[in-house]
């Protein structure tokens, strides 16, 4: 039997429902956040969408930058050309959260979709409904994850 247990230096989880209750995924995320914080010594960061232009944040979001995000928020986030708000999720375990505003990516949508088609064969012209919103949030979340992983 293999006793391997991965111990990542940082665990990142992204979802449309981080600090944005829409359905059942929110319940799944909040119900296990405390246990994940314990198991990973607080080295987990949740990434969700920033859906407001004002300082009117979700009621379950604490707008105080957690220690694990202070340096990244100060040094790296400003260079990414996206608006970020760092804080904690008001749920058991109070996990750190990065909310990312993906709206600026709409200006680059055609280029981003072309790159997805060219590299991965994704036919974005077949998307409908909230395709753009979900896709652009996914790209913004991936950029955020990359930055967090590359940050010293």
Identify the function of each model-found stretch:
Residues 1-152:
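Catalytic cores of nucleotide-sugar-dependent glycosyltransferases that transfer UDP/GDP/TDP-activated
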